[in-house]
Amino acid sequence: MTITPQEALQRTIEHREIFHDEMLHLMRLIMRGDLSPVMAAAIITGLRVKKETIGEIAAAATVMREFANHVEVQDNSNFVDIVGTGGDGSHTFNISTASMFVTAAAGAKVAKHGNRGVSSKSGSADVLEALGVNIDLQSDQVAASIAETGMGFMFAPNHHPAMKNIAAVRRELGVRTIFNILGPLTNPAGAPNQLMGVFHADLVGIQVRVMQRLGAQHVLVVYGKDGMDEVSLGAATLVGELRDGKVHEYEIHPEDFGLQMVSNRTLKVENADESRTMLLGALDNQPGVAREIVTLNAGTALYAANVAESIADGIQLAREAIASGKARAKVDELVRFTQQFKR
């Protein structure tokens, strides 16, 4: 069933839901650039004001996946994405990127989907470039990277070219819209497992149920109650877990895993170079908060990837990957592998 853009806008004004097929139609218009900037801006703002439903987000993510340049991965076992929505305003170093190296070193395959920093001082793309990684790979090269190194970085603009049709509107609006939460839902490699950090407590239950509708296997959506879009050391973390088709919501604390609750203040960085230094320090097994929060998040990712039986088991595997030097070696391995494709 189709709906006109004007009807959709009226629906948002009346705080009524746009149904699945209607949302598919609208989103395709946006992704093809067939809506005027005024209409596109009005609809995505209207959705934000009325609050997007699980069904609307799932439909939008379905279309964004349709328009993506996909990465074909042959073996889906222990395959995980570690990603945050960003926008948490914490300005910490790239914890999920550091966790990628540890998670891969401990036996998972990681497809990291990311971009340059917008709200943060250093996005995943920025810190990977600072480390010497070539982020500008084609889809087949990313697939080769995952097969060879256990890691692949998908630079969002290379995989979502249709997003250029809404980029100017989003930039001019300058407020969060549905597109801020679609990125983590649209991994171009289709990783069935995921550790996803979100910027608001309400999104925990929403995003995990969107992933349920999209057919994901094992997903942990997390929100640190100190405002972090990661598993936090500074507060309890809300978790929405999808496993075997069922959703469970619960809370975890650093002390549950023998970790001390400490402030995340020392994790703040001003730029990608500072983030690089902190990331390498953690992977070099330097004692401190950076190493502990990477261990905690990598351990959670290893549980999501089904490499570990529990978060606690995952943390133990993460500790071993760091202490053995395997996690640090993964950085050099990814740099070497991706540099051969330098154009």
From Swiss-Prot:
Residues where Mg(2+) 2 binds: 229-230
Pathway note: Amino-acid biosynthesis; L-tryptophan biosynthesis; L-tryptophan from chorismate: step 2/5
Binding site for anthranilate 2: 170
GO BP annotation list: L-tryptophan biosynthetic process
Keyword NADP appears in the UniProt entry: no
Chain sites annotated for binding anthranilate 1: 84, 115
Database matches in InterPro entries: Anthranilate_Pribosyl_Tfrase, Glycosyl_Trfase_fam3, Glycosyl_Trfase_fam3_N_dom, Glycosyl_Trfase_fam3_N_dom_sf, Nuc_phospho_transferase
Domain of life of the organism encoding this protein: Bacteria
Cofactor(s) the protein requires to work: Mg(2+)
Pfam families referenced in this protein's UniProt entry, alphabetically: Glycos_trans_3N, Glycos_transf_3
GO molecular function, one term: magnesium ion binding
EC number: 2.4.2.18
GO CC entries: cytosol
Sites where the protein binds 5-phospho-alpha-D-ribose 1-diphosphate: 84, 87-88, 92, 94-97, 112-120, 124
Binding site for Mg(2+) 1: 96, 230
Top EC class of this enzyme: transferase
Cofactor binding annotation: Binds 2 magnesium ions per monomer.
Catalytic activity: N-(5-phospho-beta-D-ribosyl)anthranilate + diphosphate = 5-phospho-alpha-D-ribose 1-diphosphate + anthranilate
Keywords: Amino-acid biosynthesis, Aromatic amino acid biosynthesis, Glycosyltransferase, Magnesium, Metal-binding, Transferase, Tryptophan biosynthesis
HAMAP family recorded: TrpD
Subunit (UniProt): Homodimer.
Similarity remark: Belongs to the anthranilate phosphoribosyltransferase family.
Function: Catalyzes the transfer of the phosphoribosyl group of 5-phosphorylribose-1-pyrophosphate (PRPP) to anthranilate to yield N-(5'-phosphoribosyl)-anthranilate (PRA).
Name recorded for this polypeptide: Anthranilate phosphoribosyltransferase
